[in-house]
Amino acid sequence: MCSSHGSPTSSSPPKRPADPAILARLADAHCHPSDDECFEGALESNASSKLGTICAMSSSLENQEITTKLWERNKNKILPCYGLHPWFIHSLSLSNSPTVPTREEHYTALFPSSTDVSQPSPSLATLLPFLPPPLLLSDFLSTLTNNLEAHPTALVGEIGLDKAFRIPNPPELASSAKNSDLQTPLSHQIAVAEAQIRVAIRLERHVSFHSVRAPQDTVRLLERIRGEPDGWGRVHVCLHSFGGSPETAKQVQKMHPNAFFSFSTIISGRSPRFHELLRAINPDRLLVESDFSHTSQLDAQVWEVFEQICEAREWSAEECVERLETNWRNFLELEPEGTGGRRKTKKQRRLEKAPVAEEVDEVEESNPK
């Protein structure tokens, strides 16, 4: 998710016109039609899109319901995703008490002074009246569970970690800078992300994960979860608009056979090492995305990154679309029990189909507007 997904500006002109036949075989693995400012326009654009699948992320508390409405109007194309983005988790209370803390109690504890943790941040007094009322994490997880159970094909997303984000100043504070100096503590982000991942594991749903300025924190979080025998290897995680280095990507792939990577030109394409990064990804783990909320631009954005992959990997259009089509299908599958999340080789898949005799494997995003 990025501030740019409100802007139709493209990072570079396409080298050739978008081919509707190819788009129909592709899935936009991560986009934000729920954030489109015009709901009816989003419905119209989703319906006219040539893409085969639009993976519609939720991000805030408010747009979980909008995601459902988009899916209800276009069930053949929209794949709904539910979750809370790290930009919107500061209202969640980790308290085990059944009573929701007051606004002052919650935010005073969440945003302490950098010089005296027993005191609130000096910036909090001005922002406090504009911050959303607290909500227990347990209550949000109940809503997340209900949404996923009501939509058996839904994914968990967008969730993750973001060490660049600062709480925006409200429009009422017009004389202030765009963003405050308040940052949701990493420990809070990790707790919320991990809680949502555990819901995904329990319900066997795949995850779309956001990571900005937090490559090693993300690696450590995923490694800790992988170390527990709770079914993590059954589900897949998509590291969306991946902005880490090629070296980090290789590290993640080695440690997490259930990890996929989706790329957008609007975010990933900013990196001077973008093509090197695309080449560092196992061909079986590549996905494409737009990360856009302007639904009229989804096709163009996905086509743009499709062309970049063709160029970086020296693939023909047909080879590229075949790989991406297969990868998306594999991403949506659950891994068999006991595989540890390892992708099956072509040989293993051929053997599974054969008769069996009887018995005797960093770019950052900016804050929202």
Regions found by a protein language model. Name each.
Residues S245-M255, R270-A280:
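Short loop-to-alpha-helix "cap/lid" segments that border enzyme active sites
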Residues K77-G83, H236, A259-T265, G340-G341:
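Short hydrophobic/aromatic-enriched beta-strand-loop microsegments
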Residues M1-S12, W303-K369:
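Mid-to-C-terminal alpha-helical segments outside catalytic/metal-binding sites
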Residues L84, F88-F130, K163-L182, V302-I309:
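Active-site gating loops and adjacent loop-to-helix segments of metal-dependent hydrolytic enzymes
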Residues L127-T143:
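Glycine-rich anion/phosphate-binding loops
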Residues M1-Y82, F88-S93, S97, S142-T145, ...:
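An N-terminally biased module of ancient metal coordination in phosphate/nucleic-acid-related enzymes
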Residues H256-S271, F292:
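His/Asp/Glu-enriched short active-site or ligand-binding loop at hydrolase and phosphoryl-transfer sites
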Residues D284-D299:
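Short acidic/histidine-rich active-site segments
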